[in-house]
Every structure is written in C-alpha cells, then in structure tokens.
Amino acid sequence: MNRLQQRQLFLENLLVGVNSTFHQMQKLSINTCCQNLQKILDLLILHRTIHSPAFRLDRMQLRQMQMLACLWIHQRNHDHLATLDTIKWISP
C-alpha cells in the first residue's frame, strides 16, 4: 500500500469515527462529542505511529482535524454558542 492509499484509508477511518460519534452522542453536548472525537483521533494517531512512524500526524494536523470535525457537527446542530465553546475547548 503506497503513501496515498494509506492516507486515504486513514481519512476514511476518521470520517467513519466522526460520523458514528455524532450519531451516538446526539443527546449530549457538542463538547462531549468533541471529547469523544479526541479519543478517536488519539487512537488513530497511536495506531499510525506504532505501525508507521513516517505517517504520524503532528499536533497542528490533529487540531485542524478536530476543528473540521466540530464544524461538521455544528452544521448538523445549528448551535452557534456551543460551537464557540467547542472552538475555545480545542484551542491550545
């Protein structure tokens, strides 16, 4: 599997994780959703680091993916204040 295929597989796994987390957490707050997304991302990055250090993601890439995931959730929740709280929670 070449680098492009591995990256595509990683992104597909991330999208599946985001999607399943959103559907499981509808009754909870957006911050809870993002905390669960953080766990998913941590596991994916740990897996990637253990199995292929060349493909490990840096902190900035992790933050960008968290932000995209939270914006994705916001688009389905339409809760502006919750999104602002989440952005503050994500920010270093």
Swiss-Prot record:
Belongs to the rotavirus A NSP6 family. InterPro entries: Rotavirus_NSP6 (IPR006950). The keyword Ligase does not apply. Pfam families: Rota_NS6. This is Non-structural protein 6. Interacts with NSP2 and NSP5. The keyword Cell membrane does not apply. It comes from the Viruses. Keywords: Host cytoplasm, Host mitochondrion.
